[in-house]
């Protein structure tokens, strides 16, 4: 995980003993001290929370997750438990949940797999194998089909070029290949799209999209919308959006999870928790710019209770 916006520790400096004691006290006896739980979980980095879990188990002989499960409930519990996982473990659990049982929640597979770096994909695959004793790739293959399966399997290879160099000639060639594979023929040749969208660096893709605009006179998004549909379209558009501006993509996902009637709490939790130490500050700025309101304010008006308090604390 890139730590360019890592959450600072508590002002007094991180003290794992004190935190473990405080959490134990918060869960002891009658009632639960939710404020103490919120303060510690939201005010520590992911690595520090791992240390607290280990310390807690060593000191009290109990798993902190199990203790919190018995003390908390609802979306507050879900968020607290999400914060106790390493980011790769939490993403792996989200993917497994999206696939298990009847039906598959493709939007979760797309959001997670289309937005991660090679290193993050590899960590998620390892966590999945460790937690569920199964291969993520095999499960994705078994749970998806057709061209969506192909692009997700391509992404699981973690084979994207992550260099900074831009090859203008390649951008022009890729733009032409994308045109020939989509608008330039009957039906769409998804292999060309997969090859380009799953393997080129984000910088290279931006050059390709520009070349496409010049060559064809329309946005790559427009072409994708005309040529594809359903989940495949969602996956391609997510890859394009993320190459252009991943923070913008997540800002929009957050906005859509809250606007209108009802709130998609799962998406809200997933994005706030998984982006907290990656690009949440940038997402907040983008959200403000796009919607003329702060993400914290919208979360405040859309959630309640301790769930709201924990999310708002994570957003600061």
From Swiss-Prot:
Xref: InterPro entries: Annexin (IPR001464), Annexin_repeat (IPR018502), Annexin_repeat_CS (IPR018252), Annexin_sf (IPR037104), ANX13 (IPR009166)
Annotated tissue distribution: Detected in epithelial cells in colon and jejunum (at protein level). Detected in epithelial cells in jejunum.
UniProt entry keywords in alphabetical sequence: Annexin, Calcium, Calcium/phospholipid-binding, Cell membrane, Cytoplasmic vesicle, Lipoprotein, Membrane, Myristate, Repeat
Subcellular location per the Swiss-Prot or TrEMBL entry: Apical cell membrane; Cell membrane; Cytoplasmic vesicle
GO MF annotation terms: calcium ion binding; calcium-dependent phospholipid binding; phosphatidylglycerol binding; phosphatidylserine binding
Residues spanning the signal sequence: none
Annexin repeat ranges, renumbered to this chain: 14-85, 86-157, 169-241, 245-316
Any Gene Ontology biological process: negative regulation of Golgi to plasma membrane protein transport
Gene Ontology cellular component list: apical plasma membrane; basolateral plasma membrane; cytoplasm; cytoplasmic vesicle; exocytic vesicle; extracellular exosome; extracellular space; membrane
Pfam family, one: Annexin
Lipid-modified sites (N-myristoyl glycine): 2
Topology of the protein relative to the lipid bilayer: Lipid-anchor
Result, substituting residue 2 to A: Loss of myristoylation. Loss of location at the cell membrane
Written domain comment of the UniProt record: A pair of annexin repeats may form one binding site for calcium and phospholipid.
UniProt protein name: Annexin A13
Organism whose genome encodes this protein: Homo sapiens
Lineage, top ranks: Eukaryota, Metazoa, Chordata, Craniata, Vertebrata
């Amino acid at each position: 995980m890139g730590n360019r916006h890592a959450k600072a520790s508590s002002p007094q400096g991180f003290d794992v003993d004190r935190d473990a004691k405080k959490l134990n006290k918060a869960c002891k006896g009658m009632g639960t001290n939710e404020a103490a739980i919120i303060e510690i979980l939201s005010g520590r980095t992911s690595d520090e929370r791992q240390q607290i879990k280990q310390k807690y188990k060593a000191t009290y002989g109990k798993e902190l997750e199990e203790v919190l499960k018995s003390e908390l409930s609802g979306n507050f519990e879900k968020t607290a438990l999400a914060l106790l996982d390493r980011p790769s473990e939490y993403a792996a659990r989200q993917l497994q949940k999206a696939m298990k049982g009847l039906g598959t929640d493709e939007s979760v597979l797309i959001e997670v797999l289309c937005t991660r770096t090679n290193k993050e994909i590899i960590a998620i695959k390892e966590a999945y194998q460790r937690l569920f004793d199964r291969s993520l790739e095999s499960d994705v293959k078994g749970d998806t089909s057709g061209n969506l399966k192909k692009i997700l399997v391509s992404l699981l290879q973690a084979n994207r070029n992550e260099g900074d160099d831009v090859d203008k000639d390649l951008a022009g060639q890729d733009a032409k290949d994308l045109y020939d594979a989509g608008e330039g023929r009957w039906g769409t040749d998804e292999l060309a799209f997969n090859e380009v969208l799953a393997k080129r660096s984000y910088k290279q893709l931006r050059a390709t999209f520009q070349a496409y605009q010049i060559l064809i006179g329309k946005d790559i998004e427009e072409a994708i919308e005309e040529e594809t549909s359903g989940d495949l379209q969602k996956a391609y558009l997510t890859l394009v959006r993320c190459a252009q501006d991943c923070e913008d993509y997540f800002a929009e996902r957050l906005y859509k999870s809250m606007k209108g009637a009802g709130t998609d709490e799962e998406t809200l939790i997933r994005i706030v928790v998984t982006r907290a130490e990656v690009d949440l500050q940038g997402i907040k700025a983008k959200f403000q710019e796009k919607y003329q309101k702060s993400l914290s304010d919208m979360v405040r008006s859309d959630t309640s209770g301790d769930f709201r308090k924990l999310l708002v604390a994570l957003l600061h």
